[in-house]
Amino acid sequence: MSNPSNRASMRGQLTLRGVVIGVLGCVIITASSAYTALKMGALPWPIVFAAVISLFFLKLMGNASLNEANVTHTIMSAGAMVAGGLAFTIPGAWMLGYADQISWLDMFIVALAGTILGLLATALIHRHFIVDAALEFPTGNAAAQTLRATEAGGKTGKQLFGSMAIAGIYSVLRDALGVVPSMLCTLNIPGVTFAIYNSPMLLSVGFLVGFAPVAFWFAGALLGNFGIIVGGTAAGLFDVMTAQGIVKSLGMGLMMGFGVAVVLKDILPQVAGIVRGLAADSSTDTDEQSLISGSLKLDAGIIGLGAAAIAVIIAIVLDLGPVPAVIVTLFTFVTTIMSAQSCGQTGIDPMEIFGLIIMLIVAAFAQLAQVKLFFIAGIVAVACGLAGDVMNDFKAGAVLGTNPRAQWVGQAIGGIVGALVAAAVMVALVTAYGPDAFGPDKSFVAAQASVVATMVSGIPSVPWFAGGFIAGIVMYWLGIPAMMIGLGVYLPFYMSLTAFLGSCVKLAYDKWAAHRDATAGLSDEERAAKDAAFQEQGLVVASGLLGGESIVGVILAFVSVGLSLLG
């Protein structure tokens, strides 16, 4: 049982007015996110935007604490990644001519199953990633800094909102007006998207994550793009298309191997400890260990029963059969771990990649109609998208001192609302525009879903996937960040290069600060205080740049939806 102070804390942070504001905002943000993901082939995190809006409306209604605003924005932003999970997968089936075989109920069950699995998984992995590993989660940190600056005002507020304004204006010039290009320094290299992405957000991600982790990310990008694609084709080992398939397979294998290794090394021992009753007093440290019931043992039972129930629902309602349903349910827990690690270190949640991985695994063991494979990818993508959002929110809560149980309940509310809204918006769009409007060079590019449609035929290179899978497990046990390397191998080179440049700025920033402090003749205490203030300034400005671009991305989505409705 949780102690009274924790219950009081939860009641003070999860309020009726916060739930109402959060749900209304969730409906709007979820709808715009579905449209954005389909129209632009991308989906910016709405977390910072939701944090600012939540605090604004709560203050209009009277006094509001940062923790109440944090829980409210958790509800408000939850549906965005649910919408992204659907939009990044299901339209692939429309492109292949299966639109008439997918109903609103099918999409809702896909979204709901993914939402519940994501919630159950994050209750299990919260402590590992937020407390033990204490990953950066740059987007969650940005939300926390935004709330603090909004509350405190003063110099920190000016730095944050000034940098947000700069990034926001720049994003409008780039995305709405086309005054500045999206890509810089592009080179025509067959099979490699060599460019610098003209994005304050991605530069800030590199700055916030730091040089060392991003260096591994960039090393993976160099290996995949120049080692395999450029080097392999130059040596005559394979053509460009084959090399690209090898790179995708290797990247997926590395990330999958990492996810399995985390389960084997870190998560299963925790579960085994619960089963053996090693956590004798479930009332201690409940905010860090137990999010659902307040009891570690009861939580384990709830998670197990919940997962079993979802497997049954998937098997019956979506007609996948028992074996595929069990595979999807179990492996979704692995991919949510991968998602949490990726978001924690890079700020990027490649949810459709994880959906692809499990879809291809199921396809290798079961004979299913192609349209059913999209359901599998959708469930996993929704779960991973929601998990990334939850873990970012937990990070903001850790910074601000918010009760994680209140956040988890808020996420459940927002996730379920988001599942309803996202499915409805998807049906509305395909009904209004027709399935032929979705795909490359169409009104709705749905880039990620197009990739899923292409991959339905199978893993491009099974040997390279298997090799990457084994390497991912071994590398994690050796302390090598396989997830970062795998991301670098898989993601477009321009994203990795831009993030690396941001991390180089952070490296130079730290070295300049160290040199300045060393030559200033300060005492150890003065040097430590000045260095802390300097690091906070860098964090605030980088968070502002990240938040400014994400806020403008959401606002532009609102404008796009409005113009479409009017026109």
Give the ranges of each region predicted by the language model.
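Alpha-helical multipass membrane-protein architecture
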Residues: 1-567
